[in-house]
């Protein structure tokens, strides 16, 4: 290997392959075309998207399953098109590598007035913009340092679980660099243990555990980002305390455990308020992920487990590897001293469904979402789009080893359709390498509203082109129902154009009888829903399966109905003035 060389582009792509990227998303453009010539020779699969925004969303979805994803765009127009997706990945800690093909070094150095710029010779503006949504950036300009710079940036992506940007000029693509660097893998350096801080933190946490009377556990979404999942689940099983997740954390805990009660919502407010200790793993306290901070416990009754620190009350113990700390905490628990919390919580699996007539129209208030739990199975990847689906999926009881994406903080509507494309590709890549729960035909299931679907519908064509196995439940409630609940329930700005949604698959190239099938269903009544959920072609088939569910425009999950009712009260009060 000594003395051997390879093009810089292949060094970058082979590094991504080593880190677990098998498929790379993007859109070709004149500054990245020669770069893309090296994708397949490097061992990667190219997935071309309809636009850069969707490519970024897809890379984000891929990264949440495979722990890293990558997207390629062209300089300026392409990268700015993708920046919304990159910002969302930054906000919700998805490790995405954004690779940007840029003009030749000579053009940049001479400040040439060329296309995709502001025509003023300033090539640094886009670098500055990207600094706000990435944790590390580099523009490769020197073949001697380029490999080490690539390694440095990729390490930052892994270390912080957030996006990075690598810009590669056209004339740097073929530059030869040593192969030798690929012989050593990029790995997060092991944290140096801090024995005194560990002991102090363990003693502080154990003291709070043993002295509590009414404890609970909350698992939040940043648990996913830093390799804590297995240890957190073991801790929950060992201690046996009532456990909830945030919306962002749903799918990260085994919901079949008897002490796991699903997503903590305002319905559990009285219980949460009564607790004198809340252990929070991977906290992410945005207003939308915490029901306007209801889930954020007061300092005096909380222990927060963050990636590099433990906070007990107001005391913060820093530089502690949280995964190792949780393992030590579990081992040192004295079961005889752990308090039991007597409560009247009912496990979701024991809750009864409302009685409905088969001929009645389906409604979200009639237990619509709860009826999907028997349909779900081990290995499913489930996505609930911002809007009514994002709240509805809270009601699912997930089987073990199931993943669920739902809105947390960024809430860019339309994200989930391209994210389903990315997640399904990650699922396929894992199946191909026999790393996916020994399953050969797993499913990606998307729940999305009509308004969100219209935002990014083009990627349905990519799902079809890539022959992915995706199930889509499209909630047709005639517009932006979540916005109607917030404000303007009868305003035209919350309407969307009526589409023939079930014709979309045919328009985008699928057919009913070919190798890659697209199957469609329509649901209006409870009998329709029961029939569709028991259809083996939907549950066990392959290809694209799409179900259009018709609902009233002001039908929404409970939490949104509360907002709608408040809006009506305000309108009535205003009318009396």
Curated annotation (Swiss-Prot):
<dbReference type="Pfam" id="PF02775">
    <property type="entry name" value="TPP_enzyme_C"/>
</dbReference>
<dbReference type="GO" id="GO:0004737">
    <property type="term" value="F:pyruvate decarboxylase activity"/>
</dbReference>
<keyword id="KW-0456">Lyase</keyword>
<dbReference type="GO" id="GO:0000949">
    <property type="term" value="P:aromatic amino acid family catabolic process to alcohol via Ehrlich pathway"/>
</dbReference>
<feature type="binding site">
    <location>
        <position position="30"/>
    </location>
    <ligand>
        <name>substrate</name>
    </ligand>
</feature>
<dbReference type="InterPro" id="IPR047214">
    <property type="entry name" value="TPP_PDC_IPDC"/>
</dbReference>
<keyword id="KW-0210">Decarboxylase</keyword>
<protein>
    <recommendedName>
        <fullName>Pyruvate decarboxylase</fullName>
        <ecNumber>4.1.1.1</ecNumber>
    </recommendedName>
</protein>
<dbReference type="InterPro" id="IPR012000">
    <property type="entry name" value="Thiamin_PyroP_enz_cen_dom"/>
</dbReference>
<dbReference type="Pfam" id="PF02776">
    <property type="entry name" value="TPP_enzyme_N"/>
</dbReference>
<feature type="binding site">
    <location>
        <position position="116"/>
    </location>
    <ligand>
        <name>substrate</name>
    </ligand>
</feature>
<feature type="binding site">
    <location>
        <position position="450"/>
    </location>
    <ligand>
        <name>Mg(2+)</name>
    </ligand>
</feature>
<comment type="subunit">
    <text>Homotetramer.</text>
</comment>
<feature type="binding site">
    <location>
        <position position="477"/>
    </location>
    <ligand>
        <name>Mg(2+)</name>
    </ligand>
</feature>
<feature type="binding site">
    <location>
        <position position="483"/>
    </location>
    <ligand>
        <name>substrate</name>
    </ligand>
</feature>
<dbReference type="GO" id="GO:0005829">
    <property type="term" value="C:cytosol"/>
</dbReference>
<dbReference type="InterPro" id="IPR012001">
    <property type="entry name" value="Thiamin_PyroP_enz_TPP-bd_dom"/>
</dbReference>
<dbReference type="GO" id="GO:0005634">
    <property type="term" value="C:nucleus"/>
</dbReference>
<dbReference type="InterPro" id="IPR047213">
    <property type="entry name" value="TPP_PYR_PDC_IPDC-like"/>
</dbReference>
<keyword id="KW-0786">Thiamine pyrophosphate</keyword>
<dbReference type="GO" id="GO:0030976">
    <property type="term" value="F:thiamine pyrophosphate binding"/>
</dbReference>
<dbReference type="Pfam" id="PF00205">
    <property type="entry name" value="TPP_enzyme_M"/>
</dbReference>
<dbReference type="GO" id="GO:0000287">
    <property type="term" value="F:magnesium ion binding"/>
</dbReference>
<dbReference type="InterPro" id="IPR011766">
    <property type="entry name" value="TPP_enzyme_TPP-bd"/>
</dbReference>
<feature type="binding site">
    <location>
        <position position="479"/>
    </location>
    <ligand>
        <name>Mg(2+)</name>
    </ligand>
</feature>
<dbReference type="InterPro" id="IPR029061">
    <property type="entry name" value="THDP-binding"/>
</dbReference>
<dbReference type="InterPro" id="IPR012110">
    <property type="entry name" value="PDC/IPDC-like"/>
</dbReference>
<comment type="similarity">
    <text>Belongs to the TPP enzyme family.</text>
</comment>
<feature type="region of interest" description="Thiamine pyrophosphate binding">
    <location>
        <begin position="388"/>
        <end position="482"/>
    </location>
</feature>
<keyword id="KW-0460">Magnesium</keyword>
<dbReference type="InterPro" id="IPR029035">
    <property type="entry name" value="DHS-like_NAD/FAD-binding_dom"/>
</dbReference>
<keyword id="KW-0479">Metal-binding</keyword>
